[in-house]
C-alpha cells in the first residue's frame, strides 16, 4: 500500500532545524511503556506529525516519535514510548530516560491531518499509535464544530490500554467523541506487570465496554466507510491489515491516511 504524497496532503517541511527540550517528567505506565514530558523551544510541527529525537543516552542514534500534544508556544511536548522486542534503543528510552535529560529534536514529518470539511472522523490507534491521534483530538477541541469522531484503540490485553483513564475522561467530556477500546483477549496474562499494579486507577473502561479484536476486524464491522475520513496509526502489521480490510470491504482508499512504525 503506497500513497502519493500529493494525494495524502503531506505537510511540506522547511529547512532542517534543530530544537532542544528538557525532560521534566517520566511516567512509567507499564513494564514496556513510558510517557515522557518535555519543555523547551517551540517546535513548529503540525498536530499528528512525528519528529526525530536524539537523547543523551544514544546521541548518535535517531528515533522517530509522535507528539501526543499539539504544538504549543510554551514548548510542551509529550511522547509515548513502547519498548519493541529486540529493539534496545526503544527499550533504553523506556527504562533509562530521566528528568533533566536534554533531547535534540529535528525533522517534523507526516500527513495525519484532519480535513477542515470532515463531518465524521474515524481514528484507529494500535498501541502507542494513540499519541498522534490524541494530539489531533486535542487540536479538534479548538474548532467551533468538531467532526463526529470514533476513536478505536487497540491492545492485546486490557492492561495494555495504557491510557484508559485519560481516554475515559476525554470520552465523558467531549460529546462528539466516542471511544471504542478493542482487545485481542479480554483477560490479562498471568505474569504480573508491577508498573501496571502501581499505577492502576479506578477510572477506565468496564469489562463490558471492551470490544473483541483484532483491531482491524472491529473497525471493519462499520465498513464500508464511504463518507468518513479515516486516520490509522500503529505497528506495521496492524496498520496494513486495517487498511487492507477496509479497502476490501468497500472503503475508498482516498478516504484513508495512515502511518506505521
Set out the residue ranges of the language-model regions.
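Ferredoxin-reductase
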Residues: 4-101, 155-157, 182-186
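Reductase modules of NAD(P)H-dependent flavoproteins
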Residues: 15-17, 152, 157-261
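Short, glycine-rich nucleotide/cofactor-binding loops
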Residues: 121-131
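Structural motif
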Residues: 120-122, 150, 229
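Histidine-anchored nucleotide/phosphate-binding helix
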Residues: 130-142
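A short, basic/flexible loop-to-alpha-helix module at the beginning of a structural domain
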Residues: 106-119
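Short, conserved phosphate/pyrophosphate- and ester-handling motifs at nucleotide-, phospho-/glycolipid
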Residues: 48, 129, 235
Amino acid at each position: 500500500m503506497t500513497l502519493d504524497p500529493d494525494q495524502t496532503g503531506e505537510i511540506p517541511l522547511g529547512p532542517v532545524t534543530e530544537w532542544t527540550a528538557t525532560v521534566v517528567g517520566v511516567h512509567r505506565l507499564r513494564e514496556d511503556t513510558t510517557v515522557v514530558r518535555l519543555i523547551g523551544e517551540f517546535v513548529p510541527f503540525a498536530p499528528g506529525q512525528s519528529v526525530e529525537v536524539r537523547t543523551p543516552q544514544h546521541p548518535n542514534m535517531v528515533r522517530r516519535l509522535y507528539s501526543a500534544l499539539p504544538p504549543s508556544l510554551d514548548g510542551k511536548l509529550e511522547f509515548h514510548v513502547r519498548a519493541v522486542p529486540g529493539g534496545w534503543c526503544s527499550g533504553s528510552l523506556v527504562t533509562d530516560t530521566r528528568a533533566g535529560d536534554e533531547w535534540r529534536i529535528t525533522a517534523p514529518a507526516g500527513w495525519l491531518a484532519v480535513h477542515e470539511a470532515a463531518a465524521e472522523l474515524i481514528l484507529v490507534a494500535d498501541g502507542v499509535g494513540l499519541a498522534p491521534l490524541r494530539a489531533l483530538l486535542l487540536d479538534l477541541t479548538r474548532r467551533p464544530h468538531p467532526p463526529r469522531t470514533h476513536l478505536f484503540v487497540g491492545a492485546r490485553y486490557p492492561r495494555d490500554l495504557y491510557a484508559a483513564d485519560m481516554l475515559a475522561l476525554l470520552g465523558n467530556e467531549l460529546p462528539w467523541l466516542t471511544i471504542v477500546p478493542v482487545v485481542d483477549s479480554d483477560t490479562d496474562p498471568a505474569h504480573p506487570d508491577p508498573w501496571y499494579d502501581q499505577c492502576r486507577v479506578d477510572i477506565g473502561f468496564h469489562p463490558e465496554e471492551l470490544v473483541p479484536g483484532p483491531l482491524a476486524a472491529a473497525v471493519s464491522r462499520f465498513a464500508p466507510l464511504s463518507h468518513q475520513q479515516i486516520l490509522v496509526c500503529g505497528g506495521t502489521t496492524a496498520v496494513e491489515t486495517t487498511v487492507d480490510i477496509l479497502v476490501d470491504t468497500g472503503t475508498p482508499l482516498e478516504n484513508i491516511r495512515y502511518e506505521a512504525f
